[in-house]
């Protein structure tokens, strides 16, 4: 009974707060590592609450889902031979045999790997509003974030060292790989324009400070997350910041 009461309390808590401060943020863009070969897609969905400190400053914590990822640079791998049972084919010296071309030269395969990583993310940014005109604001944002990885996958294509169909493509859970880290934390900054309606559109960047993977048998280098997002924020009260002080300009 007590657990049910607590669950109901936390479920209804957002509705007990003033609706004018609730907001929903959606974002999409690009993510990678500082040393990644190419960026991949990034997404963000978060529900937040803005605590106004005065007519310019506000604290806006939010909690939601963040999708990140990265790509590794392509690399060559030997095209190894296996028998029908998937066991390595070896020569008299016990060495794993490698496929060769018509001239007897070893054949190599180009291996490509890309990663997705899904996080539950808590943002704690500070907003500064600069009034441009009536009902129109420029919003500057800076703060910190912390996140915990809950899912994702590594997709490998063209791995010549694998057997059977895995030479073509296979996947592994991102956070089950040796050297992977679920915790992520870093800094965030951005700028946005608040329309006279309930919508705010902007750009934000997230800079990871903690390595999310270490050098290991599964990773050739250490990596930290970085992302750039186009964001859209919906405020549940269209009358937000209608009244401005005389010194707002």
What residues fall within each predicted segment?
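Residues on the lipid-exposed face of transmembrane beta-strands in outer-membrane beta-barrel proteins
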Residues: 26-30, 45-55, 63-65, 122-128, ...
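Extracellular/periplasm-exposed beta-strand and loop segments of Gram-negative cell-envelope proteins
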Residues: 32-38, 68-119, 148-184, 188, ...
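Membrane-proximal, glycine/serine-rich, low-complexity loop/turn segments characteristic
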Residues: 137-145, 206, 242-249
